[in-house]
Design a protein with these regions (language model features):
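Intrinsically disordered, low-complexity, mixed-charge
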Residues: 1-88
C-alpha cells in the first residue's frame, strides 16, 4: 500500500490537530503516526489506499476548526507496515 509523508504548515499546534488527525485516520482506516515538529508544524506518515490517503490529505488542508493551514507538503515514501495510528 502507498505510504506518504505530510508536512502540515501554519497554525497547527495547540489546536488539537494531532487528535483530529488520529480521529480521521481511524475513521477512514489509515495506519501510521502524527507528531509535532520543533519548528511549529505537524508531520504525519500514513499508509493506506490511494483513496484513503487522498481523503486524509484533503482533511489535512483544513484540519480542525481552530487550525489555519498554510501549506501541506506531500512526499511519497517506501511502504511502512504499521498497526494502527498513533500520536507521537
Amino acid at each position: 500500500m502507498p505510504t506518504n509523508r505530510l508536512l502540515i504548515k501554519g497554525k497547527v499546534q495547540g489546536v488539537f490537530f494531532r487528535a483530529g488527525a488520529k480521529e480521521m485516520a481511524n475513521k477512514i482506516g489509515l495506519t501510521g503516526w502524527v507528531k509535532n515538529t520543533i519548528d511549529g508544524n505537524v508531520e504525519a506518515l500514513v499508509t493506506g489506499t490511494a483513496l484513503q490517503i487522498d481523503e486524509f490529505i484533503a482533511w489535512s488542508r483544513q484540519g480542525p476548526k481552530r487550525a489555519i493551514v498554510t501549506n501541506v507538503i506531500i512526499t511519497r515514501e517506501e511502504e511502512e507496515p504499521f498497526s494502527g495510528f498513533i500520536i507521537k
